[in-house]
Regions:
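A mature extracytoplasmic/lumenal domain signature
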Residues: 95, 106, 202-204, 219, ...
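Solvent-exposed N-terminal domain segments of exported/luminal and surface proteins
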Residues: 29, 33-176
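N-terminal export signals
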Residues: 1-14
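Terminal accessory/anchoring regions of large secretory-pathway or extracellular enzymes
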Residues: 15-52, 58-61, 79, 316-317, ...
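Acidic, contiguous internal or C-terminal segments within carbohydrate-active enzymes
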Residues: 202-251
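A contiguous, surface-exposed recognition patch within enzymatic or periplasmic domains that forms
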Residues: 51-53, 145-147, 238, 242-373, ...
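Extended, loop-rich substrate-binding clefts of extracytoplasmic carbohydrate-active enzymes
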Residues: 157, 162-220, 339-347, 351, ...
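Short, hydrophobic/aromatic beta-strand segments
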Residues: 102-103, 211, 237-244, 318, ...
Length: 489
């Protein structure tokens, strides 16, 4: 009787079919050889026009989770379609080399004030989330979610959701308009009883390309996603983004943007970090511009890049509900040579914190040719910092303020073990600017942080953007990463 009851509580399944990773690539290859077919987004009348609050009222029942009660390290819960998430997503369980489709049942969900769909209607799902005991051994925490277009996000131990990653970006920041690829099918491999990772396969489609993915997800103090992807363009892709990520920067000490708010900062990420192929480490603080801005960091075979949340102190935010200090950083580590290209940073004006206004991705220099196969492998690290903390001092805070007419003062704080024992007399700040005058450069220990403070004044006569670079050096040797910034009048 117990086994029968458990069967009634777990998701219904269809007939199995053989599966291996090559099948997803073959499906993507075949899809790209045919005209694009728009996704199924048809919903019953009572679901297609849901607002945010009514959609939130539809909740998955945890006791219906895939593998619930089987004493496995992972469980899967599903999202209902509706609101922004109208597209149908099909999800399969893979076990013993067989893929079995998870059939939609309205009984998996509670609908609040919403009328449930009619029985027997197969709506599919909008997406899913993975649960595992990451914070304590007796509770399956949510650690990763795939929901909406090709968006996904994850958290490490003790963290809250923040920025998102995407499977692929196309024409982001281009005048002709962005194209949003979407995951249409997932295959989730059933883990063993002692598994520390879980594997998810995905099929992506879009007007311009199809793609196949294999994600290996390893939760922990840093949650790591190994991503293997193969892209099959229908047309030449000259503005494609690899390892794309999306975040929010509303305001901070470098850019309050005329916001009247009791909080000192509001952001999911405060800067872009790059470890380029030349071995140079860059830090670019984010800002909320008045107009769309695109920054290009040309490179050859980058070691990594990511959107960081370096401010981990509650007092930097003063927000009891949002917990910005617990939002993760996201670092993308290419595996193998990615060749010529650039890290692209796109900053979009926003007047509200609810909008993601920051995009970062790797743009290959050479367009991806139609009818070909283009493969990439990379590793995404979700956690408190980049996976391999640098020996160089790093910039932890950027403050900007007025300093008389046509002048600004920049105050940059740095932290790092090396700074605690260095001879202050041997350290100097190096600052350069295009189309502006830099003066009063001061570098000194910061006893409040145990680090260092570099400050300077910038005089600007022309109302044009100014590109800035700053670092700390000891003799001819760099002892900090390089701070780069675009100041816009």
């Amino acid at each position: 009787l117990a086994s029968i009851a458990r069967g009634l509580l777990t998701p219904a399944k269809a007939q199995p079919a053989p599966f291996d990773r090559s099948i997803v690539r073959q499906m993507a290859r075949e899809a790209a050889s045919k005209p694009f077919k728009a996704p199924d987004n048809k919903l019953p009348d009572n679901l297609k026009d849901l607002d945010y609050d009514h959609y939130r009222a539809i909740r998955f029942s945890p006791d219906r989770a895939l593998w619930h009660g089987e004493k496995l390290p992972f469980e899967v819960q599903f999202f209902h379609r509706g609101f922004f998430y109208a597209n149908r997503v099909d999800i399969y369980e893979v076990a013993n080399g067989q893929a079995t489709k998870i059939a939609y049942q309205p009984e998996y969900f509670s609908f609040g004030d919403n009328a449930p769909p009619k029985a027997g209607v197969d709506l599919g799902f909008a997406g899913f989330r993975l649960h595992t005991p990451i914070n304590r051994p007796d509770y399956h925490d949510e650690i990763c979610v795939f929901l909406g277009a090709s968006y996904f996000r994850a958290v490490a131990k003790g963290e809250l959701y923040g920025l998102s990653a995407r499977g692929l970006s196309i024409n982001t920041g281009q005048a002709k308009g962005e194209e949003f690829p979407f995951f249409k099918t997932f295959w989730i491999e059933k883990p063993g009883a002692n598994a520390t990772s879980i594997v998810v396969h995905a099929l992506l489609d879009s007007e311009s390309a199809a793609a196949a993915y294999r994600f290996t997800i390893r939760p922990g103090d840093t949650t790591v996603l190994d991503v293997e992807m193969a892209v099959y363009p229908r047309v030449e892709l000259d503005h494609v983004g690899l390892a794309p990520m999306t975040s929010m920067f509303f305001f901070g000490p470098n850019d309050r943007n005329d916001v009247d708010d009791f909080r000192p900062s509001v952001h999911d990420s405060d800067g872009l970090a790059i470890f380029n192929g030349r071995g140079e480490e860059l830090w670019r603080p984010l800002h909320n511009p008045k107009d769309l801005q695109i920054s290009t960091f040309s490179d050859l075979n980058p070691h990594g890049f990511g959107l960081m949340q370096r401010q981990k102190n509650f007092f930097a935010y003063q927000d009891l509900e949002s917990g910005f200090e617990r939002r993760p950083s996201l670092w993308a580590e290419p595996i193998g040579d990615w060749g010529d290209g650039s890290v692209q940073l796109i900053e979009i004006p926003t007047k509200e914190e609810v909008h993601d206004n920051i995009a970062v991705f790797w743009k290959p220099k050479t367009a991806l040719q139609a009818k070909g196969e283009h493969t990439y492998t990379y590793r995404l690290h979700w956690g408190p910092d980049a996976p391999k903390p640098s020996a160089l001092a790093r910039f932890s805070r950027t403050g900007v303020g007025a300093k008389g007419e046509d002048s600004k003062i920049f105050v940059l704080d740095l932290v790092g073990e090396k700074l605690k024992s260095i001879d202050p007399k041997s350290v100097r700040g190096v600052v350069s600017a295009e189309k502006a005058k830099v003066q009063n450069i001061v570098s000194q220990p910061n006893p409040a942080t145990g680090g260092w403070r570099l400050s300077f004044e910038l005089s600007v006569k022309e109302k044009v953007p100014v590109e800035l670079r700053a670092s700390l050096v000891q003799g001819a040797d760099a002892i900090s990463e390089v701070w780069v910034y675009r100041w816009t009048p």
